[in-house]
A protein has these predicted regions:
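C-terminal regulatory/interaction regions
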Residues: 59, 63-129
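Generic structural signal for well-ordered, non-membrane alpha-helices
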Residues: 52-59
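Alpha-helical packing segments of well-folded alpha/beta enzyme cores
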Residues: 17-20, 57, 114
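Functionally constrained cores in energy, signaling, and assembly domains
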Residues: 18, 47, 126
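Histidine/acidic-residue-rich catalytic or RNA/ligand-binding cores of hydrolases
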Residues: 43-52
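Metallo-beta-lactamase
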Residues: 1-44
């Protein structure tokens, strides 16, 4: 199994998401039943993978905000590239048996939506004094 954080518009809050995963893991579940999917085992491995991807999304996003504070269109374009690179690498590292190009093709909608969600989050926190 392979999972990744959803950062789709407009609800992405990395700290709240991280806290939710940590609360679930504190209960030491044997398995999970993600919405729209069946049972998954290997919960500790999946949680670690999920949190590592979340950390990467957050760090990359904050770096982009620092580099491009006033250029939302350029941030979105860069976010699409970063999200794509992160998700494709993560899927392949988890054993997905396809080429990087095919993984990118299969993840295209998720890449687009997650980049948009990251862009909304960065715009929101970029306005915060």
């Amino acid at each position: 199994a392979w999972i990744f954080p959803s950062t789709t518009p407009v609800q992405f809050e990395p700290e709240a998401l991280r806290s939710s995963v940590q609360r679930m893991m504190a209960m030491q579940p044997q398995c999970l039943y993600p919405t729209h999917f069946g049972r998954v085992d290997g919960v500790e491995r999946l949680a670690a993978q999920f949190l590592a991807t979340l950390d990467r999304f957050e760090a990359d996003g904050l770096a982009l905000l620092a580099r491009l504070p006033d250029d939302a269109p350029a941030r979105l374009a860069a976010l699409k590239e970063q999200v794509a690179a992160t998700l494709v690498a993560s899927a392949l590292a988890a054993g997905c048996p396809v080429s990087p190009a095919r993984a990118h093709e299969l993840l295209a909608l998720d890449i687009e939506l997650n980049a948009q969600g990251m862009a909304v989050w960065l715009s929101r926190i970029g306005r915060t004094p």
